[in-house]
């Protein structure tokens, strides 16, 4: 049986008494979570939170914790683009798995502020297709769109990892799983967490 969203006390600036509100206090602390497949719903939620928190205070960093098997490309690109658009730096933290679009969002964090937990796994690959569902004439259109998306993803990985195009293209040909230290060597994350340094204060 689900517990639901907890009520937490929140006092608005200028108010004397706190009121109990249905709000996730973690969001108030600017901590965001991607703990599922990337789809339109979670993408819209994260984008809305990033924009809202940026309007509320554009000087405090955002922290996006990722444990995701990946998912849809366009909603993932939406999250990535919003991370680049909002004024606060977005720290990305991989805890568990960042695969497919999860790793793409991970690499989209502010450079020098991308972190992976020691036992995290990161996986990159090329975008998938649904050719088996399409009619013959739709194959060509879908293939062209897929190539454009692959070029976009590849370009971003090249820019944000510092790796040459040929290495990124080769890695995206198949599923490439990496440990946290391998992802750091690959430029997907900047740091591997080893202990609590108190940075989240």
Swiss-Prot record:
The keyword Hydrolase belongs to this UniProt entry's keyword annotation: yes
Q: Record's SUPFAM superfamilies? A: ClpP/crotonase
**Localization of this protein:** Plastid, Chloroplast stroma
Top-level taxon: Eukaryota
Tell me yes or no: is Flavoprotein among this UniProt entry's keywords: no
UniProt xrefs under Gene3D superfamilies? 2-enoyl-CoA Hydratase, Chain A, domain 1
Which terms in the Gene Ontology molecular function aspect does this entry carry?
ATP-dependent peptidase activity; ATPase binding; serine-type endopeptidase activity
For this protein, the Enzyme Commission number is 3.4.21.92
Q: Which GO terms describe its biological process?
A: protein quality control for misfolded or incompletely synthesized proteins
| Major location category of this protein | plastid
Q: Which residues form the active site?
A: 100 (nucleophile), 125
Q: Which GO terms describe its cellular component?
A: chloroplast stroma; endopeptidase Clp complex
User: Assembly and interactions?
Assistant: Component of the chloroplastic Clp protease core complex.
Its biological purpose is as follows: Cleaves peptides in various proteins in a process that requires ATP hydrolysis. Has a chymotrypsin-like activity. Plays a major role in the degradation of misfolded proteins.
Family label? Belongs to the peptidase S14 family.
Q: Under which name does UniProt file this protein?
A: ATP-dependent Clp protease proteolytic subunit
Q: Which species?
A: Chloranthus spicatus
> Gene name on record?
clpP
